């Protein structure tokens, strides 16, 4: 049976992951640790014999720079890359820039968990005169006002990620190209929910660690057979638990 592999990588730790802030579409860069995570992911993929024909990422530099570091370690810096806002992190609305633990102290752990992980729950909206509104950013100049989010739930994130997967990424895989996607916690959770047909309750508990390659294997009909992380299982579990704990009051 012919097996097709897809590699997903959540960006390495960002400066705002390190400061425990809601980031969303804010274009913060990788921390020093995050650069190291991205390089380590590339080294691991090289050791395991991976190489790629095409890459996808978002229009946010923490994902772009993660991909650059991964491809650099693979000696594939030349690889063609498509950047799309449809792979951006979920938009966190008026929470963007706020400290997660301080927000939990103010509103309670459960409310923040729902904002972070509730399937159809949207954080408080931005207003269009807010400097954080994406309509002020030239990289989104081609988007319609309807496409520009004031806030997003995971459900709304799925509404942009999955059509992009089906219409753009999957056809490349079906043509035989080996694909890597460097994206974000919630855009990847959106894709994982779809691929694994997870329930809303199951996706609530899923935490994707930063900078760890996640491999999906597909059968000849492009149905997922299995998935697994590359690397030390205990370290990966600890990183996933740390992601889950970010939204709790200290």
Curated annotation (Swiss-Prot):
The record marks 184 as: Transition state stabilizer. GO terms for molecular function: phosphoglycerate mutase activity. InterPro entries: His_Pase_superF_clade-1, His_PPase_superfam, PG/BPGM_mutase_AS, Phosphogly_mut1. It comes from the Bacteria. Pathway: Carbohydrate degradation; glycolysis; pyruvate from D-glyceraldehyde 3-phosphate: step 3/5. The keyword Iron does not apply. It catalyses: (2R)-2-phosphoglycerate = (2R)-3-phosphoglycerate. Its EC number is 5.4.2.11. Keywords: Gluconeogenesis, Glycolysis, Isomerase. The active site is at 11 (tele-phosphohistidine intermediate), 89 (proton donor/acceptor). One of its GO terms (biological process) is glycolytic process. Substrate binds at residues 10-17, 23-24, 62, 89-92, 100, 116-117, 185-186. HAMAP family: PGAM_GpmA. Catalyzes the interconversion of 2-phosphoglycerate and 3-phosphoglycerate. Homodimer. PANTHER family: PHOSPHOGLYCERATE MUTASE. Belongs to the phosphoglycerate mutase family. BPG-dependent PGAM subfamily. This is 2,3-bisphosphoglycerate-dependent phosphoglycerate mutase. The gene is gpmA.
């Amino acid at each position: 049976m012919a097996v097709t592999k897809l590699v997903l990588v959540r960006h390495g730790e960002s400066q705002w992951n390190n400061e425990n802030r809601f980031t969303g579409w804010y274009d913060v860069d990788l921390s020093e640790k995050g650069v190291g995570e991205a390089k380590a992911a590339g080294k691991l993929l090289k050791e395991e014999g991976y190489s790629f024909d095409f890459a996808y990422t978002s229009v946010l530099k923490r994902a772009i720079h993660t991909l650059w570091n991964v491809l650099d370690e693979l000696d594939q810096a030349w690889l063609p890359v498509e950047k799309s806002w449809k792979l951006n992190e979920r938009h966190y609305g008026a929470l963007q820039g706020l400290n997660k633990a301080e927000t939990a102290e103010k509103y309670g752990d459960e409310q923040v968990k729902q904002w972070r992980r509730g399937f159809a729950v949207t954080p408080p909206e931005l207003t269009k005169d807010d400097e954080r509104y994406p309509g002020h950013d030239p990289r989104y100049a081609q988007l319609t006002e309807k496409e520009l989010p004031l806030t997003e739930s995971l459900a709304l994130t799925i509404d942009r990620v999955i059509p992009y997967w089906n219409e753009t990424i999957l056809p490349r895989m079906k043509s035989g190209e080996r694909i890597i996607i460097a994206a974000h916690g919630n855009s990847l959770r959106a894709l994982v929910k779809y691929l694994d047909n997870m329930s809303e309750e199951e996706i609530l508990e899923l935490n994707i660690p930063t900078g760890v390659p996640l491999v999906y294997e597909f059968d000849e009909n492009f149905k997922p057979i299995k998935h697994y992380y590359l690397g030390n299982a205990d370290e990966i579990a600890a990183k996933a638990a740390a992601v889950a704990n970010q939204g709790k009051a200290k």
